[in-house]
């Protein structure tokens, strides 16, 4: 269901349960991405026709970055959910988005059935090395660091994400870190990282960070909470 610029999706998990998704402009920078993922009780054969309803179980909520930000030495983070130097100025903006159902463009407010829903979002990441003062004396970023294209493909209980960046900065910029993926699974208690540092279930409080250089075969990050599991998979192409 597309309604007022928001996109609501429901899909069957089993005969008693649906998964629901809510896409909208969100995070501090108002980028179009998935805002909420949850589970709804539904014993009918078809997915719920009210995917906008509050889910019985919240799986993901966008309280941080679900689109990778860049860390620029001396300038902090830009993109995703980040403010310039974590103060008040935005570090990215939405240039627009396209919604498709089975490859056909969704126009206006509508409700329909589909096997695959695709969201194509276009964002601009602003250059934090070139801040300005606006008329009110506040900080503002205006120059483009890169143009970010993100495609979300939703099938049943899976969101496949591909992102690309076309850099058009006016002067050289050093990127120290790029977070290609971040999970915001609610209430996680244990993690498992096959090929990584945690090859058995490990309590979240006892888990720490590790690098891809240390564990080059690592690609899957599995989380567990009291309701179920979530698995995040890095694709083998480019940086994942």
Predicted segment positions?
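Beta-strand-rich N-terminal accessory domains
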Residues: 1-89
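Short, surface-exposed beta-strand/loop "edge" segments at domain boundaries and coil↔beta transitions
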Residues: 13-23, 41-51, 125-139, 171-174, ...
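Coil-to-beta-strand transition motifs
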Residues: 16-18, 30-32, 143-147, 154-162, ...
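Extended, loop-rich substrate-binding clefts of extracytoplasmic carbohydrate-active enzymes
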Residues: 64-155, 170
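Acidic (Asp/Glu-rich), glycine- and aromatic
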Residues: 146, 158-198
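Trp/Gly-enriched beta-strand surface patches
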Residues: 197-240
């Amino acid at each position: 269901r597309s309604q007022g610029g928001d996109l609501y999706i429901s899909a069957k998990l089993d005969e008693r349960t649906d998964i629901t998704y809510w896409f909208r402009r969100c995070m501090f920078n108002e980028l179009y991405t998935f805002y909420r993922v949850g589970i709804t009780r539904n014993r009918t054969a078809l997915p719920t026709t009210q995917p906008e309803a509050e889910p019985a179980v919240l799986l993901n909520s966008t309280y941080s970055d679900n689109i990778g930000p860049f860390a620029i030495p001396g300038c902090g983070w830009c993109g995703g959910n980040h403010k310039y130097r974590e103060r008040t100025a935005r570090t990215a903006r939405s240039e627009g988005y396209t919604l498709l159902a089975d490859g056909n463009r969704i126009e206006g407010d509508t409700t329909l059935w589909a096997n695959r829903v695709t969201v194509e979002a276009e964002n601009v990441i602003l250059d934090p090395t070139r801040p300005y003062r606006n008329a009110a004396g506040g900080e503002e970023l205006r120059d483009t660091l890169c143009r970010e294209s993100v495609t979300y493909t939703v099938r049943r209980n899976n969101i496949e994400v591909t992102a690309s960046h076309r850099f058009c900065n006016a002067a050289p910029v050093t990127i120290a870190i790029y977070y290609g993926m971040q999970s915001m699974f609610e209430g996680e208690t244990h993690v498992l990282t096959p090929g990584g540092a945690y090859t058995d279930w490990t309590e979240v409080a006892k888990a720490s960070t590790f690098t891809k250089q240390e564990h080059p075969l690592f690609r899957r990050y599995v989380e567990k909470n009291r309701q179920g599991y979530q698995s995040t998979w890095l694709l083998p192409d480019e940086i994942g």
